[in-house]
Regions:
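Rossmann-fold NAD(P)-binding glycine/threonine-rich loop
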Residues: 5-29
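Conserved active-site and cofactor/substrate-binding residues in soluble primary-metabolism enzymes
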Residues: 14, 18, 35-39, 95-103, ...
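General beta-strand structural signal in soluble alpha/beta enzymes
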Residues: 2-5, 30-33, 59-60
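Short, ordered loop/turn segments at secondary-structure junctions
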Residues: 5-10, 35-36, 63
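A short glycine/serine-rich beta->alpha loop
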Residues: 27-33, 91-92
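Active-site-lining helix/loop region of Rossmann-like oxidoreductase modules
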Residues: 49-193
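Alpha-helical support elements that line or immediately flank enzyme active sites
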Residues: 38-51
Length: 197
């Protein structure tokens, strides 16, 4: 049996068929789980959606100080913190994270009855350091990436209905643009809009 935080929270039918056959043949199971995606992103919104008759938009969002992430090599070499904005935009993180988040969006869309468009909109934004910022991988130098925001949006007829977002900041000081965690600090947020609200 396999439990993984790397996707497989809601595999599409075409993706699931070979895995299901292998699991049945081997007497095994595959369970995808996690926090975001894998829990906060889809399970909480589905639970909260029971309080409204007509859901119009769902948002799940993470706000994290990435200085607490204990893998300097991942921060530097994969997530590309400390790189130039141009280099950071080539990071595999949009696609890597997108696999799990797309499954989350599909789960919410299916369970709430949204006829989702085929294309999920993926966005990657960066903020740069304006002064040196201490980090687990060493100083983040001015002009290099010190914060990243990844957003995946599912639409119906081009209108946003489900949004999953991560905000990873090397603290809140010396960033351009001046992103912050807001008054609430680090957190996960879930918002379900509908009628009645």
């Amino acid at each position: 049996d396999v439990v993984t935080p790397l996707g497989w929270v809601y595999p599409r039918t075409k993706d699931a068929a070979p895995l299901e056959a292998a699991c049945l043949a081997g007497g095994a199971t595959l369970h995808g789980t996690g926090i975001h995606p894998g829990g906060i992103t889809e399970r909480f919104p589905l639970m909260v959606s029971a309080l409204t008759a007509q859901v119009t938009h769902v948002r799940a969002e993470e706000f994290s100080d990435i200085r607490t992430y204990g893998a300097p090599a991942v921060l530097r070499d994969i997530m590309l913190f400390g790189a130039t904005p141009e280099v950071a935009r080539t990071s595999p993180m949009v696609g890597f994270l997108g696999g799990g988040f797309r499954q989350s969006l599909e789960m919410i869309g299916h369970e709430l009855g949204f006829a989702l468009d085929d294309h999920v909109v993926a966005e990657h934004e960066v903020a740069v350091a304006t002064k040196p910022i201490d980090s687990p991988m060493g100083p983040i130098e001015p002009g290099t990436v010190a914060a990243q925001r990844f957003t995946w949006t599912a639409t119906v007829n081009g209108e946003p209905v489900i949004t999953a977002r991560v905000n990873w900041l090397m603290g809140e000081e010396h960033l351009e643009p001046a992103w912050s965690f807001g008054e609430e600090g680090e957190r996960f947020e879930v918002e379900v809009l509908g009628d009645p609200p």
